[in-house]
Each structure stands twice: as C-alpha cells, then as structure tokens.
C-alpha cells in the first residue's frame, strides 16, 4: 500500500501572467509578456493574458476551490511589474496589497503559500535597460525580492527565487520563441549567468531579512542515450549539461559543467571562478518541475548540441508532444539526491495537456488520460521517497486551464476546466481523482482505474 507522510504537501500551481489577467490594473506596469503577446504573430491566435483566468478578481473563488479539493499548499508567482511598475523605485501599493490579500485568504483556508518571485514576466522597463543581459539586474532583483520579503515573510514560509531559468534563456534569448524574443548564441549564456547571480543575491537578501525557507525551481528533463555508442553517450551528456546541470551545478557545487564551454564555443564567457562560486548560496530546498524525458542520439547536423531526440514507438504523448514516462520522474528525483547531497525537494510542477472531451451528464468532464498521468507520476514520487529522496511535496500543474505562453489558450493543463468566455470553473475527473489521493495520503493510487 502507498502512504505518503502526514506532513507531505499536496498542492496546485499557477503563475501570475498565466492566470491573473488585469496586467495593467491599479497602477501595474507592463511586463515583457504583455509586450510580447500584443505583438502580432508571436502568440497562437493572437491570444494575450489580458483576461486569462481573471484570477486577479476571482482569487477568493479559486481559493475556495482549492479548499474543496483538499489541497494544503498553493504555489503561485508574484508579478514584478505589478509590485514595481518600472521594475525598481516606487512601489505600487495596490499591487502589493493583492498578494497580501491572497496570502491571507490561503492561510484562512488552511493552505500554505509557496511564492515564486519570478515566473518569466520581467518588467518591460527593465527589458528596455537590457533585461537579463544587464549585470545590474542582480541588484534590481534582490531589491524587488526584499520588498516581497518585508511584506509577506511573516506569513509565507516557502519562497522560490526563479522558475525554470533554462526556459527563460533557451526560449527567450537563444531561440526567440518566448519573451523577450531574442535569438543569440552569445546572449543566452549571459542571460543565464545573470539569472543565477540574481538568484544568489535574492538568497543573500533573504538570509538578512527572512526567517523561513528559500530555494529555486528548475525544470529537469532526464536524458537517456539511444544506444551504448560513444557518440550517443557523449551527445546525451551534452544535452544533460545544457538543460539540467547548467543551473543546479552552480547553485549546489559553485561551478558550471565543463561541457558548456564546448557547447557554446566562442560564445561562452570565461567567468571568473570566484564569481561563479558566489552563485552557491545555501538554499533550503530545490523545486523540480518534471514533464517528460528525452531519448537522445548523436546528430552531426543538429545545431549547438549535435544531439537529437528519438521518438518512442508505442509511447503515449501529450498534446504538447511530450512522452508520458513516469519512471523518469523517479530517476530524476533520485539523481538530485545522489548528485547534490540529498536536498529537500518539492515537485513544484507536474502535469499534462490533453484534449478535454465535451462535458458528460451533469457537467462532468472526463479526462482519463490526465487521471492516468497523475496516478503514474504521483506513484513515481512515492517510489523516489522509498529510495531515499527527501521529497516533501507535490504540486499539480495546473489548478486551472490558463494562458500557455506562445501557445495561447490552445493547450489545457488544468485539473479544473475554465470556460474563457464565461470564466466558469468546472473540476475535471482529474481534480476529483487528486482530491481522493490527497484524502487517502496516496492510498487510492493502487485502486483499479
């Protein structure tokens, strides 16, 4: 029988620009996603986060929904430009008060907040000054973090500095598919380094001002070689260094993986060793976002990594084209334990986009593929705990169907369906399944489907 610890956190996750809506309300400033989504052709169907899930106005209803599901934690991000419209300087009291009210509502309903300080929505005013390419951003970010700590740390016990810095740099500075839309092999390493420096400065600020726990959230995608050939194994190591170790090695070990200099060549800056070592600030946990794995082969013609993904026959794939492979989540959590000294881990995002069929009788929304996905992956988390990984919580991505970045509203990750015309929320079967898992501390995972 599966049984999770009594103090295990069961949560859902969202991010500010994806669910809040009203991005310019009450004195807020524009972010790079406000700018990016309003640029023609960059987001599918011309979608924006102007309304999204209208969480800015409906947050009390959403908190009540979380309570009905039985969750005891909620991970959300704060919008930097809602709090500091120009990214620095004058504080927008109305924006800060929104998060103050949200935290109070969560706690009043027995839900522990986990606050992420940055989930991709950089203030546009700072992007105009170079954004993540400007070394001064580490100070700007630490100052913003301090504003949030002073306002909320008396009630918020878990903070995350950054969400998925790899996506910020890969999508925003290397390939240009995400805001701010740059495409440069030279810019990506600089943005990555400044993100990590900003993380370190925020952790330092927290040690001076905070009283609880702080960490970082990374997306990990384990790489498996397609064969035992030296070429496939080397390609797999390059892909792993680029996506997985590029961020965790500096955070935990104070150094970058050696493969990055090979990958980027002349575009890789030779950072002073003492500067890189400063990224290694003691943190209290690491958040792991996991969605899929990658089977990797050598490809001489593939740009940058000389590596390519190998599609798997007979595998199930999500609507975003990601293979469903739960064993890799166990492997990932155990790998973090072994490589980085068994830190406290939270699975801060895990979920899948599947096509939701029409409602059944009584507004029931059956999403059996998502139910199966959650069953397998939550079971995989338990398997990692059984192997000694210090996993303390699990957050489904996502509570709500929401704005899925450059894909607009075309992909639905929510365990709660959102009608974007009416804003009606309808729990799917996956939400009801998750509620039963929580109530049984995992016991229902082994029941027949």
Mark where each language-model region is.
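Active-site region of glycoside hydrolase catalytic domains
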Residues: 1-43, 67, 86-88, 96-449
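Short N-terminal amphipathic alpha-helix/helix-capping patch enriched in small hydrophobics
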Residues: 5, 55, 59-62, 430
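A common structural microfeature
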Residues: 7-9, 56, 73
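Active-site mouth loops of central-metabolism enzymes
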Residues: 44-58
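Catalytic domains of carbohydrate-active enzymes, especially glycoside hydrolases
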Residues: 58-79, 281, 285, 339
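Glycine-rich, proline-tolerant flexible connector loops at the mouths of alpha/beta enzymes
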Residues: 78-91
């Amino acid at each position: 029988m599966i049984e999770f610890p009594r103090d295990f956190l069961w949560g859902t996750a969202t991010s500010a620009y994806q669910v809040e809506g009203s991005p310019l309300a009450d004195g807020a400033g524009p972010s790079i996603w406000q700018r990016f989504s309003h640029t023609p052709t960059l987001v599918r169907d011309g979608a924006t986060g102007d309304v999204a899930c209208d969480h800015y106005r409906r947050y009390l209803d959403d908190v009540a929904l979380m309570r009905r599901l039985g969750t005891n934690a909620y991970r959300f991000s704060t919008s930097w430009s809602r709090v500091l419209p120009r990214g620095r300087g004058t504080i927008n009291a109305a924006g800060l008060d929104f998060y103050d009210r949200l935290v109070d509502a969560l706690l009043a309903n027995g839900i522990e907040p986990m606050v992420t300080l940055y989930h991709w929505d950089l203030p546009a005013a700072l992007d105009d000054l170079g954004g993540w390419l400007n070394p001064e951003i580490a100070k700007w970010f630490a100052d913003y973090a301090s504003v949030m700590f002073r306002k909320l740390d008396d009630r918020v016990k878990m903070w995350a500095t950054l969400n998925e810095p790899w996506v910020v740099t890969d999508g925003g500075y290397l390939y240009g598919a995400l805001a701010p839309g740059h495409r440069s092999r030279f810019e990506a390493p600089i943005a990555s380094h400044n993100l990590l420096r900003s993380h370190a400065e925020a952790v330092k600020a927290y040690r001076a001002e905070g009283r609880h726990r702080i960490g970082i959230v990374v997306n990990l995608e384990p790489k498996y070689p397609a064969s035992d050939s030296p070429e496939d194994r080397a390609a797999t190591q390059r892909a792993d260094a680029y996506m997985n170790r590029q961020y965790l090695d500096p955070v935990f070990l104070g150094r970058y993986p050696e493969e990055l200099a090979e990958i980027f060549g002349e575009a890789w800056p030779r950072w002073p060793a003492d500067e890189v070592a400063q990224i290694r600030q003691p943190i209290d946990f690491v958040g792991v976002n996991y969605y899929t794995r990658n089977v990797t082969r050598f490809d001489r013609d593939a740009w940058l990594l000389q590596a390519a993904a190998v599609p798997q026959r007979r595998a199930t794939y999500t609507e975003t084209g990601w293979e469903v492979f739960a064993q890799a989540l166990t492997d990932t959590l155990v790998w973090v334990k072994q490589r980085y000294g068994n830190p406290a881990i939270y699975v801060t995002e895990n979920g899948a986009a599947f096509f939701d069929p029409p409602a059944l009788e009584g507004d029931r929304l059956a999403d059996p593929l998502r139910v199966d996905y959650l069953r397998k992956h939550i079971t995989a988390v338990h398997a990692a705990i059984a192997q000694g990984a210090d996993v303390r919580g699990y957050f489904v991505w996502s509570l709500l169907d929401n704005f899925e970045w450059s894909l607009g509203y075309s992909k639905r990750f929510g365990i709660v369906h959102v009608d974007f015309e009416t804003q009606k929320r309808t729990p799917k079967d996956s939400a009801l399944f998750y509620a039963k898992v929580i109530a049984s501390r995992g016991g229902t995972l082994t029941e027949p489907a």
